[in-house]
């Protein structure tokens, strides 16, 4: 009996253990079920007291996939317009991480948009450009080749097939061509000498038909001398930042009514003077009312020439004075007489033009000749003749003498002073007297790398105009715009040749300094007209 009872005790214990385990298992299952329900509930309602636990579970479960998440996740796009609502912001495309073709260069500097102002930094290899108006330009207006910049007109340069073509700030590009938007800036605030030559395919050029003007010197009358092509008269000058008006001959004459306009300088200024005479004459119905007061039709000899426009009671004159200063002579110690140039005295011709209403000066062409270039026993100041003086230094001293004379003798309230810059020559293969040529040139230069360096004489002139003179001067900086026009010179077409020998001799002595008429000087006169219009905004001329 006892033994049977003893045998039953373990069964009782096991039975009780089974009960306990069963109850414990049910408790664990209930707890787990409760936690599961709470987990689902907390994900929807953010129950605070279970968050730490769930967060730990999540972190342990996602640990191995976090690096993949970082690679595939797109970076945040910052909306710049929220910070600067008044500034036009370009559309930035933020690439996926790891993209090879759309990453920004490390050298790129994004303009600062703080307070609506930009830092002025340049964005390299991007489409940002400064327009000077507080906005970011469209990429079509930021075309720039070889890091060239255009001064003062907010335009860019684009190099295409070796040519220099100007894309103004308001343009559109269609099929690789440039289409002008006519909403350009005003010429009143524009650098009219910064631009390019454009083909004029209509009837606007030239200003007068070739062969129609009887007052063109034979040396400039390329059409009459047999030049076979006429493309050189079909180019017009287009400033980068604005459009300029054509020279209105009758309007010009109306503004000259009762006045005297005088060109003073060398034969290049005579070239320009003859051009203006022909343009103004062509605008009149009765051309017999225009005449040279002495009846002359050739003007090569140094002197004074005046054309009278009878209906307007005005004259347009030319005074030959290639140096401004006086050509003189000096007796040496041994009795020899030296031809000299008095750098400290004005030419005697000043009495012919000091009363003019508009004066257009130029000098430079004769300073390249052998006598002036060598400068040996030629330049004189006072009683001193310099054994040797560099031509650029002599040129500066002559200009200072001219500037002092203008300041002392010209009434700035009555007279406009204009200085036309140096006209570039195009002799290839040698200088003018040693076989230099420009024959068979039929197009302008388009590749700017072929242009000459800016003339040092013009740098000297600009310094004197800016820092020495008191009288305001309208400076016509035509050096660069003429440098493009290698096609515009008379070359061998300076006369009608009667024999083959004359033709052969002409080839070795070509004129690549002066200009055919009609031709490039017509554009100078258009720019003169526009310059005077600009000056007339402040004072009536």
UniProtKB/Swiss-Prot annotation:
Residues 91-141 are annotated as: Disordered. Not expressed in trichomes. GO terms for molecular function: O-acetyltransferase activity. It is found in: Membrane. It is a single-pass type II membrane protein. Its main location: membrane. Keywords: Membrane, Signal-anchor, Transmembrane, Transmembrane helix. Residues 114-128 have a biased composition (Polar residues). A motif (GDS motif) lies at residues 265-267. A motif (DCXHWCLPGXXDXWN motif) lies at residues 511-525. The chain crosses the membrane at residues 20-42. The keyword Membrane applies. One of its GO terms (cellular component) is membrane. Contains 2 motifs that are conserved in esterases, but it is unlikely that this protein belongs to the catalytically active pectin esterases. May act as a bridging protein that binds pectin and other cell wall polysaccharides. Probably involved in maintaining esterification of pectins. May be involved in the specific O-acetylation of cell wall polymers. Belongs to the PC-esterase family. TBL subfamily. This is Protein trichome birefringence-like 2.
